[in-house]
Amino acid sequence: GPMGPSGPRGIPGPPGAPGPQGFPGEPGASGPMGPRGPPGPPGKNGDDGEAGKPGRPGERGPSGPQGARGIPGTAGIPGMKGHRGFSGIDGAKGDAGPAGPKGAPGQMGPRGIPGERGRPGAPGPAGARGNDGATGAAGPPGPTGPAGPPGFPGAVGAKGEAGPQGARGSEGPQGVRGEPGPPGPAGAAGANGAPGIAGAPGFPGARGPSGPQGPSGPSGPKGNSGEPGAPGSKGDTGAKGEPGPTGIQGPPGPAGEEGKRGARGEPGPAGIPGPPGERGGPGSRGFPGADGVAGPKGPAGERGSPGPAGPKGSPGEAGRPGEAGIPGAKGITGSPGSPGPDGKTGPPGPAGQDGRPGPPGPPGARGQAGVMGFPGPKGAAGEPGKAGERGVPGPPGAVGPAGKDGEAGAQGPPGPAGPAGERGEQGPAGSPGFQGIPGPAGPPGEAGKPGEQGVPGDIGAPGPSGARGERGFPGERGVQGPPGPAGPRGANGAPGNDGAKGDAGAPGAPGSQGAPGIQGMPGERGAAGIPGPKGDRGDAGPKGADGSPGKDGVRGITGPIGPPGPAGAPGDKGEAGPSGPAGPTGARGAPGDRGEPGPPGPAGFAGPPGADGQPGAKGEPGDAGAKGTGPPGPIGNVGAPGPKGARGSAGPPGATGFPGAAGRVGPPGPSGNAGPPGPPGPVGKRGETGPAGRPGEVGPPGPPGPAGEKGAPGADGPAGAPGTPGPQGIAGQRGVVGIPGQRGERGFPGIPGPSGEPGKQGPSGTSGERGPPGPMGPPGIAGPPGESGREGAPGAEGSPGRDGSPGAKGDRGETGPAGPPGAPGAPGAPGPVGPAGKSGDRGETGPAGPAGPIGPVGARGAAGPQGPRGDKGETGEQGDRGIKGHRGFSGIQGPPGPPGSPGEQGPSGASGPAGPRGPPGSAGSPGKDGINGIPGPIGPPGPRPGPPGPPGPPGPP
């Protein structure tokens, strides 16, 4: 029967109580990228501001709009390195000055102190489900922005809990079947029409709200089976549904262009390294981070082509013509119900246990030398090594006239670099710092290619067959009429009821790898975490290669000899001055009686340098000095090797002298070339596997999969036996109305009508109220500690120390016959100073003596006065890049911030490329019988009486 009129609109009920926070809605499509802004001015080098006093942590302000990316300033020509100035006396530490102004971009307030964890509130009643949102029009793809540097790694999101599965909807009532009408007269048989071209699939409109169902009208008489009407057009797009609950606040926008680095200030004095701290236990695992933002929804694949049509069925027996019934009103074709929502994905299984660590791989190939960085600050002076044993003195020279004390010469060239100290033990793990503010979310990556079509599901079981109707009297077979014209466009069908929720389908085949996403913009730098305690001293790495000797300094001019002054404090050792003229050789005096050892005289001024003595015996290796804490100094130039000296004859061994006073600690020498990488560290102990965390909340529903291919038409029914036409008889009188015959077979479908226009997008709904934030989950149990990283390369050697001040000159002993070294005698009276001897040829290097035991670490000497600044050395070859150090422990993750306001929905992206055509689907179940068409008009009555019959046979005679 016809559908009744729609009832009046009901009065809206009172608003319900706010429901619990719903699942996050599907992310909107990426909007088009706006035009590129004008380039900003190049940044200026900011002055180094003085360190200000730490202010109170301010509240986090709103993220400012992202400025246009400025043109990177051109790098200035590096200036020539000036001569190093004289180090001034360390002044008293001044108070910290006010903080300098901060350059662009906009400032971001420091992270506030995390508040106390609130108690989770009771969940509110479930809110009403919002209407489905309208599908936005596909916008043009935005231009690809410039790739920024990689951002900081985001925190790992917590697992969400799986939501409850919705209840299965109830099935709608079945319509009432009308009374069968009398059969109409048989029409003329028409030719079969050509199959029409399949129309392009229309855009699926959003599902509109269900209108009230009108009362069922009285059933009209059943008419003849007419041609089916043209398919109705799609319904108009429904109004946009209410927006989902407010999502969690997104990360701040990307940071602006970083300003150019300011000029480097003079390095401050090196601090005294503190003692190594105790080894701490493993830190606790941080709180799980919030769920990440879901990726954009991928485009749906194209619909597959329809399958081949089945064979035509044989016509059934014709029924007897009946009286024409009153044509019933055409029923409104209901729109097909929208498919139910996809089933929620179950919670992921627990993570598997970590496998055993594999064997350490071979050391990687040597990388290219990096760009030379700025010289680091001056490192702290290392502790002095133990003085080696005094070498065997050479043969005594001829006694010359007593020379006058000369002035102290200029400072000598720096000595060779001392050996690298042993690496201390591993320090305790520092307490994890506060987690930095998460960086901004990068632009969404390009949509991945649509995955391959999943395997078609099994064919459903056939439905139960209906009850067999009563058999009517067979009517006369009608002649098939010509195909009717295409029907007019049907009215928009009423929206159907919600379909029952389908079961979760089998997972489809994994899609192909999507294109790599665009690199995100660099996030703003997080707040500085609390520095952890100093780590234990690590193991000593292998000794690096000895650095090349530096260039000899300029020799100073010999000044005039002044009158002897009082004994002053020992000064720095000067550079070797030119040798003075040799005085006349005096007559050798008779050996005098051995006198009593006198008290040591005052230290005189340093005399001219003496002749080179014979090489002394190799001393015991000194204790390794403490490793400096400063960064490595600049790499010096590699000097050209000097000429090889002539091989001299070995002199007789002299008596063992008293050990001299230890020299002052010199400044660190230039860094040597980086040594080979150290051996891999021991594999760390595997920690116990923590219990599986609670399942996380259900993520947003994934994008809908591509539509499956249309199933093949069902098999045809059994063909009826054709009847034989009888001879045409004389038309009889019009009989009474017979019993209606059986329902005729379904006629051929007519040509499909034109596709309707796609529905327009409805107005946007109002934004819903922000839901309360969910309770924070308990912190997870700390995971197993990671493997120990490879041992870092040994640090660069310090610069060579300056020579200490010369000690007091010892008394010259009496000359005795060359013999085995005797016990050291008491110091004799000071004799006259002999003339400077000529440098002898260098003797052969003696065999290395056995390594002596390592002595205790000597006490740290007092720092000597700062010497004059030396000339600038030439730039040395670039050193090898050091091996990457151990990775620090992750900081404790802070609580999630308050949820932000929902952003406006952007236009949909452009449709993706068509996916590959899937395999043909399995045969579908046979379709239901079509709706009876409108009965045709009754034909005119035939002529009466009929034509005369043929003459009969002759009668019997």
UniProtKB/Swiss-Prot annotation:
Indicate, by first and last residue, each region the UniProt record lists as having compositional bias (Gly residues).
277-286
State where it is primarily located. Answer: secreted
One GO CC term, this protein: collagen trimer
Q: Where in the cell?
A: Secreted; Secreted, Extracellular space; Secreted, Extracellular space, Extracellular matrix
Q: In which tissues is it expressed?
A: Forms the fibrils of tendon, ligaments and bones. In bones, the fibrils are mineralized with calcium hydroxyapatite.
| Organism (species) | Hippopotamus amphibius
| Family in the record | Belongs to the fibrillar collagen family.
Name the UniProt record assigns to this protein: Collagen alpha-1(I) chain
Query: Ranges of Pro residues compositional bias?
Result: 140-152, 772-782, 818-833, 937-957
Q: Which residues carry this modification: Phosphoserine?
A: S87, S579
Q: Which InterPro entries match?
A: Collagen, Collagen_Structural_Proteins
Record keyword Secreted present = yes
Which segments carry the region annotation Disordered? Answer: 1-957
Spans of biased composition, class Basic and acidic residues?
45-59, 869-883
